[in-house]
């Protein structure tokens, strides 16, 4: 049966199964969802078996369970290891959603729900393509699946799992659908990812919250100090001021900068889409360079003092911030973590105590476009979308990708189908049904060309 016909005939069941996953609020960042993590893993194992896997196991790790499945068609054939994650980001702020984030809806040709794209929807694309190949006796490669439940919190348990199960995870290439394209009519393959380093900063002043009238002006305010510290991490030209930060940053080759410059990009449309009047970033680089192949610093959250209704004249005892740096290949996140912490402690005034706690991180990654699996993915996109995909670096991070290369010795092809408008990590996450269908077609074509 031709793939388009297969999708049309089976789509109601496909969506029913996908929705059964989405309805499970597998939020790894919240301990109260511990049972949901197991439920989601078990549901995935069941769906892998139904799709045609020989076996599907829910395996223990140091954290949330890991789903492993496989179908071996020939011990001498090539093996593809499909990686995905079943955990999702918290849905807050809930009031900004147009529908229940964990009760999927189809509106205007899109599936709307938390995880519709990242990563339940995209990983489902992989599994449905696999299912089609199995049922139509077209699968000529061995396929293994590893689905984790901690990607959104930095994959703290996956490296040790890979170390313990190297033989089980042995493969020729890893295939991942957890990245995005440049546009619905502009398919692209991700050839690089930025790394990540993440910290929490705690600033402590007096031993208790104080009356701002009695003590204001005489005692350092931790929130004021925290803001001052953060303001010194970048300069007016958007460069990070941490000593040694740029030591291992590889300058983008001119040939790659020229390629980036040829990518269709409407800056006015970009600003309009996110409702900002002007853009800002490191001087000397374009917007597409800044958010893909240059490092960056961001404050992800900041809090302290009184934030309830009305007013309370208080000089708070503590202030906190969660901050992160996106890193580029060759920057070691452990080294950057140390440099950053040392710098923050060095510039902190004596009037407060400062604690910098590293959270999670990971290395950047680059995929060579000469890789046979990459070229098979190119053919997949060309078949499904009608045009050859552009090769682009993306600004996001999937820390485990570099770990796979280090621990398992396997390269990864990032065959993602997301769009910026899919609003991952934000309210009203969605995925267009048209892209969902084309994604299945593209992955099928990948397997037909990777033998």
What are these regions (language model features)?
Residues 1-94, 318, 335:
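N-terminal helical capping/dimerization or prosegment-like subdomains
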Residues 50, 183-184, 241-318, 329-342, ...:
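An extended, acidic, His-containing surface patch that forms the Zn2+-binding/catalytic region
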Residues 77-144, 438:
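Active-site metal-coordination/substrate-binding segment of hydrolases
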Residues 86-88, 110, 146-155, 177-181, ...:
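Acidic, glycine-rich active-site loops and adjacent beta-strand->loop/helix elements
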Residues 117, 207-209, 325-333, 362:
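A generic structural motif
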Residues 117-192:
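Acidic/histidine-rich catalytic neighborhood of metal-dependent amide-processing enzymes
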Residues 188-204, 413:
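Flexible glycine/proline-rich, aromatic-decorated loop/lid segments
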Residues 206-209, 213-270:
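Polar, glycine-rich mid-to-C-terminal structural blocks
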